[in-house]
């Protein structure tokens, strides 16, 4: 068994879609980034890569590589899942937290969990996603950005 932790943050800007957990969330702003800037999936990918001892998403998907411009983070997470499988690991469980003042994430969490479980070839009961605010404090509390943390337990198959 191996444990990994991931964290990601992106700035909120006008003129971008807000994608979280592979779900397009209707909102006046979106996250700025080289890919679709899905902080939840990026944190999860980082956690899995950490558990595998494989660095981070910047190593695997550099923001200097035009191949990842506008990339769908579900595809990036799928690549990480395939790497885990190739190394003989599967998801034991995942616990993630989105930190955002607005918009409310709760209505979208079931769809996020389904997307994540599907891409990781797991079941929804092994994927937990929750959301919180920072009560108006810090950059997320002021609505300047959104961040996410993820912790994974990866289980060796052999």
Swiss-Prot record:
InterPro entries: MECDP_synthase, MECDP_synthase_CS, MECDP_synthase_sf. A divalent metal cation binds at residues 8, 10, 42. Binds 1 divalent metal cation per subunit. GO terms for molecular function: 2-C-methyl-D-erythritol 2,4-cyclodiphosphate synthase activity; metal ion binding. Pathway: Isoprenoid biosynthesis; isopentenyl diphosphate biosynthesis via DXP pathway; isopentenyl diphosphate from 1-deoxy-D-xylulose 5-phosphate: step 4/6. It catalyses: 4-CDP-2-C-methyl-D-erythritol 2-phosphate = 2-C-methyl-D-erythritol 2,4-cyclic diphosphate + CMP. It is an enzyme of class 4 (lyase). NCBIfam families: ispF. Homotrimer. Belongs to the IspF family. This is 2-C-methyl-D-erythritol 2,4-cyclodiphosphate synthase. The gene is ispF.
